[in-house]
UniProtKB/Swiss-Prot annotation:
It is an enzyme of class 1 (oxidoreductase). This is Ribulose-5-phosphate reductase. Pathway: Cell wall biogenesis; poly(ribitol phosphate) teichoic acid biosynthesis. Its cofactor is Zn(2+). Zn(2+) binds at residues 45, 71-72, 151. Its EC number is 1.1.1.405. SUPFAM superfamilies: GroES-like, NAD(P)-binding Rossmann-fold domains. Belongs to the zinc-containing alcohol dehydrogenase family. Catalyzes the NADPH dependent reduction of D-ribulose 5-phosphate to D-ribitol 5-phosphate.
Amino acid sequence: MRKTSKMINQIYQLTKPKFINVKYQEEAIDQENHILIRPNYMAVCHADQRYYQGKRDPKILNKKLPMAMIHESCGTVISDPTGTYEVGQKVVMIPNQSPMQSDEEFYENYMTGTHFLSSGFDGFMREFVSLPKDRVVAYDAIEDTVAAITEFVSVGMHAMNRLLTLAHSKRERIAVIGDGSLAFVVANIINYTLPEAEIVVIGRHWEKLELFSFAKECYITDNIPEDLAFDHAFECCGGDGTGPAINDLIRYIRPQGTILMMGVSEYKVNLNTRDALEKGLILVGSSRSGRIDFENAIQMMEVKKFANRLKNILYLEEPVREIKDIHRVFATDLNTAFKTVFKWEV
């Protein structure tokens, strides 16, 4: 019988809101079909911040914690018994752990039995990460700080895939409601995937809307023209603005359009179902992503024009070397309009 090699891993777990402890855990480092990766750069997600601040239902926190946060990360391969990757090769890690990959009909991120790293399971705030080889995607011609948000971009890619699969073929005008980092990524994905489409962005802050220089039109939410119309739309608001945002889209979208709902709300929202039914709309819930979405995200980020645009929503923090640095990063992220990225040097 082959002897299993093991190594002590340092796992930086959130034990309760704003409290982080290091867990030392012995782990196998030569599991069959698994690749060992050392995280390099990471990005903070709103979901991480909600856990850190304790802004989830106490029952949810009790169920999910303790766990290591962060599900957006790139790293380098330190061991690969499968021979798929070279030691030192740069890769991004897929947090969605599904029983099988997507097929022609069903997506891996919605499958029963799927779990997600940094949601009740340890995320990437560890000394090293062991993942099945199909949960790793290589990259080369992308800067590490941009590669760190691949998971975030892949979520937008998944939503675009849903649109292309479900929406009717008239795609001349597409709206994005929201002016944060998700809206910016989705607008770029529209521009990349459907370059002839006119992009309409609806937001609350002119200073943020100015970043959408490639959009055809930009509007403030309380000053939308009565005659505004578009074929399909993406809702990228989340939070308390989720309901009003979706209802604005229902109001202005053309009949038989498709609305992709991407924003997360902690509370149930009221929707204008009367107009949604009258217009024959398709409302689609879109969450997380799978391997194909990561591959598509990397292809887009390899295009310099889009990689350079994505840099506009990144704030590079100082490296993290110890627990106090993690607290610093999350404090900084609270006051950052877009994505906080940092180097992981524990």
